[in-house]
Design a protein with these regions (language model features):
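Acidic, surface-exposed loops and disordered segments
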Residues: 1-129
Length: 129
């Protein structure tokens, strides 16, 4: 995992992510920090291995009072020449063998920005005996 807090790096990552969608907005919702989960794509279960890392960051952030959100499209971001150049610039080893799994944005929610949890669905979990 690599975390980026400089405004320039964060803004570059945001623009790359928006470009994947064909837009120019801020898919990172103004969050000041982005942690990118990267995995070794030569390992057959690399995506499955990397996804819990993003999920754990989401849970850890909430536990210390931060807000966090998983932002998809990391795979597409780092398949580009720009993505590969960034990894090399940042000194990430074996950049050519890495695949993006997810972007975890971190920050503090705006006042009133946190929604109440959705009501739990009844009979959603089925216990098989």
């Amino acid at each position: 995992m690599s975390a980026y807090r400089t405004k320039a790096d964060r803004d570059t990552l945001s623009k790359m992510n928006a470009a994947v969608m064909g837009g120019n907005g801020d898919p990172f919702y103004g969050a000041p920090c982005v942690a990118v989960v990267l995995v070794d794509k030569t390992i057959p279960t690399c995506v499955e291995d990397g996804q819990p890392g993003d999920g754990n960051m989401l849970n850890a952030a909430e536990s210390v009072g931060l807000s966090a959100c998983w932002i998809h499209r990391a795979k597409e971001m780092f398949e580009t020449a720009e993505g590969q150049a960034l990894l090399k610039k940042w000194g990430v080893p074996n950049a050519e063998n890495l695949r993006g799994v997810g972007n975890c944005i971190l920050g503090y929610a705006a006042d009133g920005g946190k929604k109440a949890p959705a009501p739990r669905k009844e009979n959603y979990v089925v216990l098989v005996k």
